[in-house]
Design a protein with these regions (language model features):
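Mid-domain alpha/beta scaffold segments of enzyme catalytic cores
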Residues: 1-206
Length: 206
């Protein structure tokens, strides 16, 4: 049975597990042999032109399968207009490269949904570390988003995302992806093997 960690800042605990390791541009300048996502986090915007140039360079690396984290965060120091510029550019790069978008969103759900309606992406948009309630989860799924869940989650939201819109992650937490799988499968009253099989199918779909 293969476990997929769709978003992490750590190397996998078990070498046989599949992980997409997040890299903050431009701090990761070498190919690693692992799957990677590269992105400009809304907390760490300091030079838009320079960071976007580096993002464009790195997205061409063969180990890069996603752009992110990127997104909108009303608690971040960077102005929302600046965040929007980065986000739109990141979404465009993801479209051109044919890789999925890993999204960080805090208190900007209306703006995020509006962006998706406007940009009409063909590649998957995945909201990482989703902790919102079932109502918000259902709204996002109806708009075509995928949700990724980690150590903390709302069971009702997990049920909304199951089966075809759900992923699992460890993010920056000191937790094994296998524990996340177990917790999510228990919340759905499913056998671990059934849960893992569906997540594997979801990964193949993106």
């Amino acid at each position: 049975m293969v476990y997929y960690d769709i978003h992490t800042h750590h190397l996998p605990v078990h070498p046989e597990d599949v992980a997409i390791v997040n890299s903050l541009v431009p701090t990761f300048d070498v190919e690693t042999g692992l799957f990677r996502s590269v992105g400009i986090h809304p907390w760490y915007i300091y030079n838009v032109e320079e960071q976007l140039a580096e993002l464009k360079r790195q997205v061409s690396f063969p180990d890069v399968v996603a752009i992110g984290e990127t997104g909108l965060d009303k608690g971040a120091e960077a102005p929302l207009d600046c965040q929007r510029e980065i986000f739109r550019a990141s979404a465009s790069l993801a479209e051109n490269a044919g890789v999925f978008l890993m999204i960080h969103c805090v208190k900007a759900w209306d703006e995020l949904i509006a962006s998706k309606k406007e940009l009409k992406p063909r590649v998957p948009w995945i909201i990482h570390g989703f902790r919102g309630n079932a109502t918000l989860a259902g709204q996002l799924i109806r708009q075509g988003f995928y949700l990724s869940f980690g150590e903390y989650f709302n069971p009702g939201a997990v049920r909304e995302a199951w089966p075809g819109r759900l992923f699992a992650e460890t993010d920056d937490r000191e937790i094994d992806i296998r524990t996340v799988y177990r917790n999510l499968s228990v919340s759905l009253n499913l056998r671990l093997e059934q849960f893992a099989g569906q997540v594997a199918e979801n990964v193949r779909d993106i």
